[in-house]
Amino acid sequence: MAPETPNDLGAPSPSLRAGSVRGAGAAYLMGVAVRPTVLFVTAFALNATPHEAVHAVTAYMLGFSSTLYQMWVNPDSAAATPRQLIAIAVAGPIFSLIVGLISFALYRWRYSRRPSGLLFLMFAIVAFYIPLGGSIAGDIHLALGFGGASKLQMDLISVVAVLMLSTMMFFMGKELCSWAPPWFSRSQAVLCTTAGPWLIGTILMTLVYLPIPRFLIAPNLVSSVFWAFAVIGACFSKRTMPALRPIRSLTPPDLFVTAAALLMVRLLVHGVRLAH
């Protein structure tokens, strides 16, 4: 079996790039362009739904039944103590943070020059995004409330989370842009690697997760604005690394993982009860 590592020790010449464009079919080019968006939706599903499952399992371990859905969990925690509520609330963000660190480490140390690297990068972005967003108006915010934090403390943590999330997305945008084909123009590279996942991917993700309560739709759409910093980062990317990235259309492993992720989401649409 041929190794995944690309055989490109140097940047392709302009004539080779032009030949690549002429030789590539329309379907291939479309697959290259939409791959980041598809993998963003896949990474979101593989992060968000297990994240909610961790909340449900934590509640169950603490003695509370719950119903797990594709994007939220409904624990029977009316009798829970503040400490138990905090444990349930922070379990998901801790899980996502660990997944993000592992994914980014694997990306940097092993997969950054393999086709599967783009999925690991998207996986890390989404996994970091979830706990930071939760510090603004999500799980961490709820945990602080259960712990009796003052409004000033919660506001300060939200400000820090906004700064961290904006900075993270800026640099991730620069990294994502390196996955654009070298024959793409700057605008095409930005569109396929950051603007596409943000604008098209968010809509697709919402459609995949339907039906969901209305109170979840607006926050997901609003929180996606931090992708604007990824777009800005991509715009400022020097694009000195594209020759080191294996440019691919959608691969069979991509499609398999995407199908598995979507199946997992749809299986939870009607809820799974974890009862004592």
Which residue stretches match the model-derived regions?
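Hydrophobic transmembrane alpha-helices and their immediate loop junctions
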Residues: 2-276
